[in-house]
Amino acid sequence: MTNHEQVLTDYLAAFIEELVQAGVKEAIISPGSRSTPLALMMAEHPILKIYVDVDERSAGFFALGLAKASKRPVVLLCTSGTAAANYFPAVAEANLSQIPLIVLTADRPHELRNVGAPQAMDQLHLYGSHVKDFTDMALPENSEEMLRYAKWHGSRAVDIAMKTPRGPVHLNFPLREPLVPILEPSPFTATGKKHHHVHIYYTHEVLDDSSIQKMVTECTGKKGVFVVGPIDKKELEQPMVDLAKKLGWPILADPLSGLRSYGALDEVVIDQYDAFLKEAEIIDKLTPEVVIRFGSMPVSKPLKNWLEQLSDIRFYVVDPGAAWKDPIKAVTDMIHCDERFLLDIMQQNMPDDAKDAAWLNGWTSYNKVAREIVLAEMANTTILEEGKIVAELRRLLPDKAGLFIGNSMPIRDVDTYFSQIDKKIKMLANRGANGIDGVVSSALGASVVFQPMFLLIGDLSFYHDMNGLLMAKKYKMNLTIVIVNNDGGGIFSFLPQANEPKYFESLFGTSTELDFRFAAAFYDADYHEAKSVDELEEAIDKASYHKGLDIIEVKTNRHENKANHQALWVKIADALKALD
């Protein structure tokens, strides 16, 4: 044992122990040499749960999914060099979707920076504005002052990551060789006795009485709507429904709002606005005086377009993290306040005669017509097209299941075809940067928390993150993946690019002609190709009770999918015109 080894051990033990005391329970480690002491010390910790992922990009998204589902800070650790750069997509997503990640990158010591040393690059501020905070840690020392320094930075990292708005932080550790710490006796048997831990307390932002009364006055007796985008706070669901009923306002609920699948059916929850807000005649009849928006912007483009064209209204955005989530620049009142506090205080102060019944009836009538058409069309069709896949998932998913939703077409199909249901289905997606990368790994991370967990994903997105399946094989994780294989970029069929046939297939359609049964075999997954509705039902039913990785592939046609969507919209439009 050398003094260097003791210094290294004491310094890193103080830091890691404080991470755990502050609330970290899991660490995702990407193997490497320079990160050896941190990896060994984390593995040695008696409480910390370790996952090892050899692909850094997959590791980043696995940590993201785990942190998203658990709402706890999760640690990421990698060696020096380009390994850290591979975390960048997950870090960017964590920043935009406010997920607490603590990214630890090992680095060469200062004397080996910018001198051509192997596996060394500039890692200072590597993630730029995509992290809430960056620290280039001091070289290890074990004086009392430096042990307090290491401990302090452990607490601070968790605090910053968890403080509203939540997000990623980055700590860079320069480390000199030799890199192996002392593990016998365990470095964690005495650290708690040597140092007091930092206790972290969080508060909720509230509004002053005058602001509350002003908002109540502005909303009383007015025609208003709640718009609820992606927001993962189940404690808001029932209070929001209760307030909407008291006001007589509809709730335009994105699939990721939680309100379509929180275990109850409420007519104030509007789930088919994407269909009827396309119609100019209906839009003219649905002009609110007040909008209160919670969460990020919903996925629906017709809803976005409708909100953009509203004028001379009061438009509240409730944003406790001060992130200014207002891409359409419509806000008149930015409310930096805890959402639950606002709902409760408005409920308490709102008079009982505050609602306009006719206003709500208009919304619920249109929604009922559109929903009944969607449900009837899906019940009557025997063709296993993309909408039918979502409808079958809605019908077959067991109560309290989790559903991770891929970007591009899957989230939009869920918006259209996953109507409100009286089961509790936890829906998750990466809707910060909205990328198609890392979705498999994110779903696997979430599966650590939610069971049973299902993933609905497109073929290109699945291909993009097949490496993530190694975690399922290695740790025997339970996940059912439903691949909607339309052989390419199906969403582009709905976009203006589809009108340029000369280059459409080569640049946007991007057919791969991959057969995913071989990927399933490679990662020891049970594979099912569903060619009919009955086969899909059988595969989902089997997967619901099977422990392990299941891959269900459904091959669809991009052109038919577009035609089916358009036919559905026409049918809904005709029915709504007849209603008037």
UniProtKB/Swiss-Prot annotation:
Reaction(s) catalysed (UniProt annotation): isochorismate + 2-oxoglutarate + H(+) = 5-enolpyruvoyl-6-hydroxy-2-succinyl-cyclohex-3-ene-1-carboxylate + CO2
Keyword annotations of the record: Magnesium, Manganese, Menaquinone biosynthesis, Metal-binding, Thiamine pyrophosphate, Transferase
Top-level taxon of origin: Bacteria
UniProt cross-references to SUPFAM superfamilies, sorted A to Z: DHS-like NAD/FAD-binding domain, Thiamin diphosphate-binding fold (THDP-binding)
Pathway involvement of the protein, from the record: Quinol/quinone metabolism; 1,4-dihydroxy-2-naphthoate biosynthesis; 1,4-dihydroxy-2-naphthoate from chorismate: step 2/7; Quinol/quinone metabolism; menaquinone biosynthesis
UniProt cross-references to Gene3D superfamilies, sorted A to Z: 3.40.50.970, TPP-binding domain (3.40.50.1220)
GO function terms (MF aspect): 2-succinyl-5-enolpyruvyl-6-hydroxy-3-cyclohexene-1-carboxylic-acid synthase activity; magnesium ion binding; manganese ion binding; thiamine pyrophosphate binding
EC nos: 2.2.1.9
Cofactor: Mg(2+); Mn(2+); thiamine diphosphate
Cofactor binding notes: Binds 1 thiamine pyrophosphate per subunit.
The protein's enzyme class: transferase
InterPro entries: DHS-like_NAD/FAD-binding_dom, MenaQ_synth_MenD, MenD_middle, THDP-binding, Thiamin_PyroP_enz_TPP-bd_dom, TPP_enzyme_TPP-bd
GO biological process: menaquinone biosynthetic process
Pfam families: TPP_enzyme_C, TPP_enzyme_M_2, TPP_enzyme_N
NCBIfam families the record matches: menD
Protein role: Catalyzes the thiamine diphosphate-dependent decarboxylation of 2-oxoglutarate and the subsequent addition of the resulting succinic semialdehyde-thiamine pyrophosphate anion to isochorismate to yield 2-succinyl-5-enolpyruvyl-6-hydroxy-3-cyclohexene-1-carboxylate (SEPHCHC).
Subunit organization: Homodimer.
Family: Belongs to the TPP enzyme family. MenD subfamily.
Protein name according to UniProt: 2-succinyl-5-enolpyruvyl-6-hydroxy-3-cyclohexene-1-carboxylate synthase
Species assigned in the record: Listeria monocytogenes serotype 4b (strain F2365)
